[in-house]
Amino acid sequence: MAVESRVTQEEIKKEPEKPIDREKTCPLLLRVFTTNNGRHHRMDEFSRGNVPSSELQIYTWMDATLKELTSLVKEVYPEARKKGTHFNFAIVFTDVKRPGYRVKEIGSTMSGRKGTDDSMTLQSQKFQIGDYLDIAITPPNRAPPPSGRMRPY
């Protein structure tokens, strides 16, 4: 006699993020690379042990939100504090199938405006210690380049 399992989508629950006690948990070193032209760095800029020169080193936790990271970047770059400045976040990680790196856009924030991605965390986007964060900063007087996530098809 065969037994058939029927699992519905409702029964497959996402594991909730466990809250991180920042008093007891050691922070991680987040290596952040920024551009101010609205485009992410090319992947070849991360090849052979090299990284772009625009590096920020931030000590933070896996539950850091994009809004929190935006605030930290604005502390370092006063020109990014202008209302309407757009921050597009991407994780740069080692490609396990071939030599080099891959990029995964994860969300965006805007200075002076609340957005749907503000509360997104590194942990929720499968960030792993050792990955890089690439932030494309677009000044308020220029429209950000279209991202793959916003395509109508």
UniProtKB/Swiss-Prot annotation:
Bias-annotated ranges (Basic and acidic residues): 7-20
Effect of T121A: Abolishes splicing regulation activity and interaction with RNPS1 and ACIN1
Keyword line: Acetylation, Cytoplasm, Isopeptide bond, mRNA processing, mRNA splicing, Nucleus, Repressor, Transcription, Transcription regulation, Ubl conjugation
Region (Disordered): 1-20
Name of a matching Pfam family: SAP18
Tissue expression per record: Ubiquitous.
Matching InterPro entries: Hist_deAcase_cplx_SAP18 (IPR017250), SAP18 (IPR010516), SAP18_sf (IPR042534)
GO BP annotation list: mRNA processing; negative regulation of DNA-templated transcription; negative regulation of mRNA splicing, via spliceosome; positive regulation of apoptotic process; regulation of alternative mRNA splicing, via spliceosome; regulation of transcription by RNA polymerase II; RNA splicing
Subcellular location, record wording: Nucleus; Cytoplasm; Nucleus speckle
Protein function: Component of the SIN3-repressing complex. Enhances the ability of SIN3-HDAC1-mediated transcriptional repression. When tethered to the promoter, it can direct the formation of a repressive complex to core histone proteins. Auxiliary component of the splicing-dependent multiprotein exon junction complex (EJC) deposited at splice junction on mRNAs. The EJC is a dynamic structure consisting of core proteins and several peripheral nuclear and cytoplasmic associated factors that join the complex only transiently either during EJC assembly or during subsequent mRNA metabolism.
Similarity comment text for this entry: Belongs to the SAP18 family.
PANTHER family xref list: HISTONE DEACETYLASE COMPLEX SUBUNIT SAP18, SAP18
Subunit structure comment from the entry: Found in a mRNA splicing-dependent exon junction complex (EJC). Component of the heterotrimeric ASAP (apoptosis- and splicing-associated protein) and PSAP complexes consisting of RNPS1, SAP18 and either ACIN1 or PNN, respectively; the ASAP and PSAP complexes probably are formed mutually exclusive. For the ASAP complex, the association of SAP18 seems to require a preformed RNPS1:ACIN1 complex. Forms a complex with SIN3A and HDAC1. Interacts with SUFU.
Protein name: Histone deacetylase complex subunit SAP18
Natural source organism: Homo sapiens (Human)
